[in-house]
Amino acid sequence: MSRKVSISSLTLSEPMTKPARVQVNPEDIDDLDKTQQVNNHQYNIWYSKSLSDANNKSTTKSKYRVRISTDQGFTKANKNTHICLFFSRGCCYLGSKCQYFHRLPKESDNFKPTQDCFGRDKTANYRDDMDGVGSLNKVNCTLYVGGIHIKPNTEQLLVKNFQEFGTVEKVRVLQGKGCAFVTMKTENQAQFAKEAMQSQSLVEGSNEVLYVRWANEDKNPAAQKQEKKRQQELAYDTVKQLLEQESNKKPRLENGAVNRIETINIDDESEDEGAVEDDEADDDIEETRVNSLSAGVKKNVSTHQANGTPESSSTSDENDHNTILRNSLLKDISRLKKKMVYKREEPYLTNLLVDYSSDEDDD
């Protein structure tokens, strides 16, 4: 039976306005449960299991359970951080000091496609028992829930328990096998619900122990077609939401950008005018010095006098400015003349001495 249930009202106050609650006493947790959040613990490559997975026995009921209404709150996490794995299991002993988020996954979360919402790396294929992080080659929003004690209201109990962690899209109960399939709206919600409902029970105080796994792809063509349509609708809603967010931000950005560009252009024009004048002056000086060193003083003076007439000058200030530059250039040229005469004599004398010494050696 297909049923869509939205997330119920969890708390009257805003959840992120209060610090995250310490879920358990640190002294009550075993050493194996205090392993690091992601990829920093021992890993058995033969069984493809982490050391911390040793306590996750499907036959043992968990002593802890997350209560979103009371446990979630702000922590020391930044915007690029993942959700706390131990918070989803109800056994985080850090509370507001935790470096990860203590909240439900949001549709706006932009986690890496190669990782789950807890920051764990996905694998190419599912494990043989369909447990673990999941596959990076498939977006799976459906969970297999086993170990259920079938009751007349099992479907309602599943919806009640799983809707705390997201939007329940579909629930299908197999009465004769003691299992069910629960489809969440997004994969991140399914990842969180999988960890939160692992080794739990649908009714508080019951002896049942749920084991939650990833569901295999349904072989029914009608179910596959329905799942494909649901994924397309979800992608369409996501794109539509992103476009609406961009359209709301765009007018503000455009107005700010136009004002900024106008001010920058005004400043750039004034700076460019001054830079052009300085560059012209520097070019005149460099050309004068280079030409005077290569071709002689008189030729340079005549060249500057020929180029000294201002091209397309419009104001008297520019003419005065050019005249001052030419006078200063003439002074520099006169100084260079004396140096050039002195420097020309030294190489000449050196060459004579070198020639004389070489002749003596030949004799």
Curated annotation (Swiss-Prot):
Note on domains (UniProt): The C-terminal RRM domain and the zinc finger motif are necessary for RNA-binding.
SMART domains according to UniProt: RRM
Similarity comment: family membership: Belongs to the RRM CWC2 family.
Region of interest (Disordered), ranges: 246-325
One CC-aspect GO term: U2-type catalytic step 1 spliceosome
Biased composition (Acidic residues): 265-286
Purpose of the protein: Involved in the first step of pre-mRNA splicing. Required for cell growth and cell cycle control. Plays a role in the levels of the U1, U4, U5 and U6 snRNAs and the maintenance of the U4/U6 snRNA complex. May provide the link between the 'nineteen complex' NTC spliceosome protein complex and the spliceosome through the U6 snRNA. Associates predominantly with U6 snRNAs in assembled active spliceosomes. Binds directly to the internal stem-loop (ISL) domain of the U6 snRNA and to the pre-mRNA intron near the 5' splice site during the activation and catalytic phases of the spliceosome cycle.
Species, as recorded: Candida albicans (strain SC5314 / ATCC MYA-2876)
Main location: nucleus
Domain of life assignment: Eukaryota
Organism taxonomic ancestry: Eukaryota, Fungi, Dikarya, Ascomycota, Saccharomycotina
UniProt-listed PROSITE patterns: RRM (PS50102), ZF_C3H1 (PS50103)
Name of this chain's protein: Pre-mRNA-splicing factor CWC2
